[in-house]
């Protein structure tokens, strides 16, 4: 996670879990507050600087196709260290974050790497039973909400791994 949610990226600790939920505003699966479904769950395993991320995760950089008109969306590694001033970054061309988002993205200071994740998608999110739903923000937040005991919820997600569109389950 290298873009958006700067406060969450600054404050999240290694070992924390991050969950993405449907919402009223999600065009493909709008859901009412209190009825949100799980889009993804990911365990933070590393916090890297943007420079470290740039060097270690070349495969997460968007690239132009052969006709140089279309950019293939491979990921969020869009901030290249400035060779003349390594504390500054150059935003590479991409299809999802304009220059107007750069300051906000870089305020996050870190990129969160999640080596264990479960992606259900916004088109087929996972329904979580009421008794094990974690704390979910009522409105969009930049920092998230902490759930003290999320073990039952995490185990439920792991038991439904066959419904994932993509996973790197451990």
Question: Which residues does each PLM region occupy?
Answer:
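Contiguous surface segments at macromolecular interaction interfaces
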Residues: 52-170
